[in-house]
Curated annotation (Swiss-Prot):
Recorded name of the encoding gene: CLIP1
Superkingdom as given in the UniProt entry: Eukaryota
Membrane topology (UniProt): Peripheral membrane protein
Keywords: Cell projection, Coiled coil, Cytoplasm, Cytoplasmic vesicle, Cytoskeleton, Membrane, Metal-binding, Microtubule, Repeat, Transport, Zinc, Zinc-finger
Record SUPFAM superfamilies: Cap-Gly domain
Function statement: Binds to the plus end of microtubules and regulates the dynamics of the microtubule cytoskeleton. Promotes microtubule growth and microtubule bundling. Links cytoplasmic vesicles to microtubules and thereby plays an important role in intracellular vesicle trafficking. Plays a role macropinocytosis and endosome trafficking.
Any one Gene Ontology cellular component term annotated for this protein: microtubule plus-end
Protein name: CAP-Gly domain-containing linker protein 1
Biased composition annotated in UniProt, kind: Low complexity: 32-49, 140-168, 319-333
PANTHER family: CAP-GLY DOMAIN-CONTAINING LINKER PROTEIN 1 (PTHR18916:SF44), DYNACTIN 1-RELATED MICROTUBULE-BINDING (PTHR18916)
GO molecular function: microtubule binding; microtubule plus-end binding; zinc ion binding
Coiled coil: 351-1353
Subcellular location: Cytoplasm; Cytoplasm, Cytoskeleton; Cytoplasmic vesicle membrane; Cell projection, Ruffle
Zinc finger (CCHC-type): 1412-1429
Amino acid sequence: MSMLKPSGLKAPSKTIKHGSTLLKAPASVATAPAEKAPSSEKSSSTTTADAHDDFVDDFRVGERVWVNGNKPGFIQFLGETQFAPGQWAGIVLDEPIGKNDGSVAGVRYFQCEPLRGIFTRPSKLSRKVLTEDEANGTQTAHASRATSPTSTSTASAVSASPAALLPSGIPQKTSPLAAKEHSTPSQFSNLSKTASGSVSNLSEAGSLKKGERELKIGDRVLVGGTKAGVVRFLGETDFAKGEWCGVELDEPLGKNDGAVAGTRYFQCQPRYGLFAPVHKVTKIGFPSTTPAKAKTTVRKVVATPAALKRSPSASSLSSLSSVASSVSSKPSRTGLLTETSSRYARKISGTTALQEALKEKQQHIEQLLAERDLERAEVAKATSHVGEIEQELALVRDGHDRHVLEMEAKMDQLRAMVEAADREKVELLNQLEEEKRKVEDLQFRVEEESITKGDLETQTKLEHARIKELEQSLLFEKTKADKLQRELEDTRVATVSEKSRIMELERDLALRVKEVAELRGRLESSKHIDDVDTSLSLLQEISSLQEKMAAAGKEHQREMSSLKEKFESSEEALRKEIKTLSASNERMGKENESLKTKLDHANKENSDVIELWKSKLESAIASHQQAMEELKVSFNKGVGAQTAEFAELKTQMEKVKLDYENEMSNLKLKQENEKSQHLKEIEALKAKLLEVTEEKEQTLENLKAKLESVEDQHLVEMEDTLNKLQEAEIKVKELDVLQAKCNEQTKLIGSLTQQIRASEEKLLDLAALQKANSEGKLEIQKLSEQLQAAEKQIQNLETEKVSNLTKELQGKEQKLLDLEKNLSAVNQVKDSLEKELQLLKEKFTSAVDGAENAQRAMQETINKLNQKEEQFALMSSELEQLKSNLTVMETKLKEREEREQQLTEAKVKLENDIAEIMKSSGDSSAQLMKMNDELRLKERQLEQIQLELTKANEKAVQLQKNVEQTAQKAEQSQQETLKTHQEELKKMQDQLTDMKKQMETSQNQYKDLQAKYEKETSEMITKHDADIKGFKQNLLDAEEALKAAQKKNDELETQAEELKKQAEQAKADKRAEEVLQTMEKVTKEKDAIHQEKIETLASLENSRQTNEKLQNELDMLKQNNLKNEEELTKSKELLNLENKKVEELKKEFEALKLAAAQKSQQLAALQEENVKLAEELGRSRDEVTSHQKLEEERSVLNNQLLEMKKRESTLKKEIDEERASLQKSISDTSALITQKDEELEKLRNEITVLRGENASAKTLQSVVKTLESDKLKLEEKVKNLEQKLKAKSEQPLTVTSPSGDIAANLLQDESAEDKQQEIDFLNSVIVDLQRRNEELNLKIQRMCEAALNGNEEETINYDSEEEGLSKKTPRLFCDICGCFDLHDTEDCPTQAQMLEEPPHSTYHGSRREERPYCDTCEMFGHWTADCNDDETF
């Protein structure tokens, strides 16, 4: 409350004024409006004025009187007032039990202290004290009005000095508060504020009345401040009392077409007509209803709610009475307004509208100043009240301090008495405690000894049993050790026999080596000089095979030595363990004997200790009894004054005894617990002993198992060595067979080419497996490096042997002449074999064509799959869009629910504030205008919300339908794709089976050809024995190399089997990843084994090719002998062409290898993609289930929406039932709404952007999911193919796998790499989009919360008292029905265009009948002439 503007009123002087002067000031103030008032008002108040003139003549200013016969005081004012017509008397009371300080509604009539002034009718004054009966007799008739809220609720105003106004010589009571008020000179500036709120009320009402009267038919008007239209009707109606204005609106926002309840008042289109009270209709451009005025009135009401509650002015009284009358008699509110406005409009005739507005504003400012003065008066009252309370507090504190001192003295005395008694008690208790301790110690020792004795006895028994068990276990272990030694001896004998067998096999090998050497010598003598090149290559291969054989022998010896070492080490370990077990048994026997001796000693000591403690216990008990008797004697000899204390001591002794007994029982329990613990410990020791024995037994069993496993391993290894030796023997025998086949190796070219192709296909499969197992590359590189080193050594040896072979071949040229004769027969066989080769080649080409067709079919299926993936991606994107729409609708529903909650809260607050507003509201008509406008806005908002809710429901239904349709489409598409995939798989499987059948037929033909070839070779062997001996040496060398390679293969296979066993053992303990690693290692080793096999096959093929070359050269020599030298040149050209073909085949083979490596990489990538696709397929299924759940939730939400609608309807009914005038203006709420709408628009724009990003992210996710599903399917196909390849790899090498599958796998690998790259890119994009979505969702939530809490943020600038009122929303009120909270006047169903009968009104009287109204009380129910003038103000 800082500096305020000067009011223009002079402060009253401090000197005492006489009655004559006092009468002039208010009279002048009162006469001014009285002169302006028309004669009609004078006629209404003459009766009351004349009735009081007699009383005024009797009394004079300064005379001592009693108000109502019981309130003494002095008359300070006599005359007319502004707050009510007629003569009034202003009295200064002796005590502060009045209602003001001489001023009412900002007009000062006299001056006195606060709460000492009162205005009353002169008829209520008396010059002497009246009895209660007399006072009651005068007041019974008008008790109801005397105690009305308007009379009792008038509060005090600004404080001032009372002595200044009282006449001299009059005794006066002054309180300390009054003295304080005299000393504050600043309060004199606030003494007189002449502008009144009542005048502002009246001027406002008058201006409104003028506005009403200025309305004409055809004027442009605003109904409720928002609906524009043209006046078509003015006058009274049948559906409600009062003047009504029928308006034809510009937009279809009305309720009818000019007719209500069957009677037509004007003509317009349907929903363009609207009826409203005249005071709610404003002419466009009318100055009295400006927004600025509305704001100031609202600010005035909100600023001082507390002051108005306590001390309303005369204007507030008049407004309250008008509001009360409007509430009590709803249909006649307009009549009240018209009458009051007509009464006050006569005073303001002759002035323009602008002057009236200025006056209204000045009066409003003055009323605010008056209210500030009232607030200051309240503060002064509060300070005086606080002073009085402080004095009372001081008195109370003094009394409290005295009482505290007295009580402290008493407490000191009592403390001394208690301390003396406590000392005696403590001494006695100490003695008792000492004796207790002694007894407890003795009992505890006795119990300990008994427990230790029992424990020792149990321990002895247990140890005896344990000794017996250990002796039995020793005997058992000795028998086991004997058995183990016997088994060791048996294994040694077996090893010796196996060693002798190995020696025999080695001798056989030496003999075979000698035979090979002899064959070499024969070959050297049989070969011709022209075969230098071929013999060199053969010798090189023979030397390489010999080296491999030597290496294999060395490795075999190493393995044998390592096995021997392992066996010896295991034997030593077993012996050591047997020794440790025997030593531990001996120790246990010694420990048992020591324990027995200890037990005997402990038993003797326990018996001695028990006897000693028994004697001590008896002596202690006797001494304790004596002490107790002495204490009893001392108690009996005490003084009579201490009998009470002794009685207390006895009770304490009994308590002590009880405690002692409890402690004894507790000790017994403890002892029992300790016994149980000891027993448990003994049992634990027993368990430990058992565990030790079990562990020893387990160790023995483990040792036995180890021995058995070692023996088994040794036996297995010996069996393997024997098998290897047997295989070597078999291979030696096979070498003899192969020596016979050497001359006919030219016929094997076709078969070898087929084998080469089969090996190439298997190499491709193996390469794919090698690429899948990426970790096996390191081992393969190491092996390749070793192979390269071996090849370098072989090349060095070959260069050395070439020089030697050139010399040896010169002597062999002569033998070739003999062979020319036999070549003619061989050529015939060769021709037949070539024909068969051509047939096989044709079959191979047909098989290749079939594979190409299969590849084309696979490509077509892949294209179909891609198309279906795109369709699935589109469907998933649509599903995600629907999901986003669902989420948006759910958020909107939540916002609507929150708005409804806010409205209900506002309703509750408004209901609570109705009573306060009824007391404190001043300008009821203006406020009702504002509140009606606010209520209309709220109704429109509710209608908008309902429309939005219906739209949201429709959208939710549409979304549900769309989701169901999309889900059905997705399911149908998935089923169709599954069916197509299954059909394609069946087709592929049929093709594979056909290919297999073709391969089997080709293999059977190949076997038949082999059989024929073997028969023919067996026939040719007899003829060419001499030539075969020369080739035997080469074959032996090659077979030795094969043996070495096969041994290596066998060793690697055994290692692989061991690794498999280890993997199976590790499955229980390790995870799947370790198992996979071990399996990968095993596969790597298998790949290495296969590579070595392939290398050996390649070396064999090279040797065969060299043989073929030799045979070709022999053929050429025969042709030279039979034919001319020209034929020899032709044969050489043919040989060159064949060599070129072989080289081309080699190049193609290498290219195929590279392609296989690439495809294997692609296969691995595809497998990874398949895994991801499988995961995404699972996610998609989860999303389908989530969609179903969302649909269920939607149905639940729809049900909730219906319930909410029902609640809204019920809430509207409740709101219509309780409606009152509100204080908050729509300007603040509209500004807030515009701000929030702007913020909402911004948020919606952001949401649209986010939705676009979400849609893109979801489309990417759907693409990834489809790719992952394809990947899973491809993985399944790859697994099936791998299983088939494994099954085929177990078959002989001659079996060829279909090339069509390999080609399909290659294509899949290429597409898989591209898909993997796309998936990685899409995953990165999806992660970024998800982050953005999360951030933007957080922003949206914050903005929504800010939007919901916006009203609270806007009202922070108001005072703490205004915060509660600023949140309140206006209540609906209908002027036609006179009901609150149901609907607004513009939305009243009675004026709606309906064929139904009009509803019954709540007013049951005749509408044409004029109701009685009192101008003084401003209430309905009686006329002004019948009013009791006993009221006070």
